[in-house]
Amino acid sequence: MDDSEEIAPAVQSILDAARERGGGGDRVSVTPKSLPDAFEAAADAGRTPVVAEIKPTSPTADGERADDPVDLAQQMVEGGAAALSVLTEPDHFGGSTATLERVREAVDVPVLRKDFILHENQLDVVEADVILLIVRFLEADGTDDLADLLTAARERGFQVLVETHTAAEVEKALDAGADIIGVNNRDLGELAVDLGTFEAVAPDIPEDVTLIAESGIQTADDVTRMRDAGADALLIGSAIMDHDAATDVEANTRRLTRANTDAVETTTTDT
């Protein structure tokens, strides 16, 4: 992707800000909690594996949550989240590395650093169990190569979630060696959400790859739809956070992590 290729202005602004942010200091070395193991444990316990996302705000959300992120994280885990995603992008999402550090120290589930990493030195900003690399952003001029970044991240101990949107991007992720792939239902060109995106792309992804459906998952029916299409886990932000101080984050998380299990639990109880 060069700078002339269509991309939503809000996303272009995020990309431009990511170019300006510097890297870390000393090279980090991480001993991560396993994301695939966390998903398997959740499924074995009768829960839908969900990565619950802590983001104070976003360009596509109304309002902002001022709750203590650690409190939110603990509520999400109590609600059954298998893992957490913490925004560290400061300019558009209100995130920070300090928040990630506090959350990771407070919970016993894997924590994803949700940011827009373009260069190797940006890996060394903060420790996390998982980092995000976005194929479309890494096609932009002046960014590091996806395969090189994937290798550099693994050398530091990170697990890597490689985000895609199209079949072509999935192919690039697989060619680079990705073993955890996310399919974003949101088109970064128009910001429109279509759950059919995941359904169209998922069949191209080998079974030995951990597959995560991202964006647009709001209801129990959406959860079932994505799981039926092959998602090993779901990354959910707005439907849990809702950017409303009155929203019950724990209840929202539980509603979605139990979306595919209520009928089973009811049957078992009745028996």
UniProtKB/Swiss-Prot annotation:
Any one GO molecular function term: indole-3-glycerol-phosphate synthase activity
Pathway: Amino-acid biosynthesis; L-tryptophan biosynthesis; L-tryptophan from chorismate: step 4/5
Known EC number: 4.1.1.48
GO terms (BP aspect): L-tryptophan biosynthetic process
Matches recorded under InterPro entries: Aldolase_TIM, Indglycph_syn_Halo_TrpC, Indole-3-glycerol_P_synth, Indole-3-glycerol_P_synth_dom, RibuloseP-bd_barrel
Family of this protein: Belongs to the TrpC family.
Name of this chain's protein: Indole-3-glycerol phosphate synthase
